[in-house]
Amino acid sequence: MQKAELGINLENVIILKGATSTNSDPRRMERFNAFRADVLKNAQFVNGTATMNIPGEPLRFRNNNISIPGKNSELKQTITIGNIDEGFIETYDLKLLAGSNFGISRQLDSAKVIVSESAAKIFGFSTPSEAIDQQIILDNVTRTIIGVVNDFHQEGLKKPLEPMLFTHEHPFEFGLYSMRFKGNVDEAMKHIESIWPKHYPNDPLDYFLCNDFFNKQYNEEKRLNKILTMFTLFAIIVASLGLFGMISFFAQQ
């Protein structure tokens, strides 16, 4: 699947299953940041991010309790909410159309959001630049739009593009760690394997490739289409045999 079609780049992204031992650790975000910093010491890696969901699966949160100051009514359309960090945009090769990315401090970004281009339009802004530094009210909390990114397909081309809003949050559960690399995946994994025990000694290392995960939905579709084609051919053959038998019967009369 091409980035031009999806709006997001899934090639050369390793997905690590997050460490469950840090679920109750209030410093889990700092621990991930330290792990990511160690990963990025290797020149093969571009960036990394921790998220609750990855491309190929739906984002868990949707919200229509959003309003714009100065406007009388709440928005009618539901907005998909994603929790990301400052590494997400570069890791998945999104375009920052206007404004800025999140910083490294979640506390400083607690009242800031990044939105997709279609979400900005729903909020009433005609261009991405117009949305920057504007305020929205999400669940009765005023937040400032600091950036606008391109629209992208979170689940696949058969699902319509969803307007999205992103907050700077580390997964409140163990989440998933996405690491973009250059070059050979085996060499990239050797580096991760060498540093994982230092940061997460009580957690096994489990990984897969983002592109493979995303394409599973299409592989299943291909399998079902193949089965349907086989049944169709079988039905045609049975019908043809029946017709041939009927013709033979009448020919003998």
Task: Label each region the model flagged.
Residues M1-N12, S248:
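Alpha-helical transmembrane segments
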Residues E5-G7, P55-E57, A235-V238:
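AMP-binding (ANL) adenylation modules
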Residues E5-G7, R28, P171:
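Flexible acidic/glycine-rich loop/turn elements at helix↔coil and beta-strand↔loop transitions
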Residues L10-R36:
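Short extracytoplasmic
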Residues R31-E220:
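Mid-to-C-terminal secondary-structure elements
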Residues E117, L209, L228-F231, L241:
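Residue-level recognition of transmembrane alpha-helices
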Residues N219-A235:
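N-terminal membrane-entry
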Residues L241-Q253:
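Intracellular coupling helices
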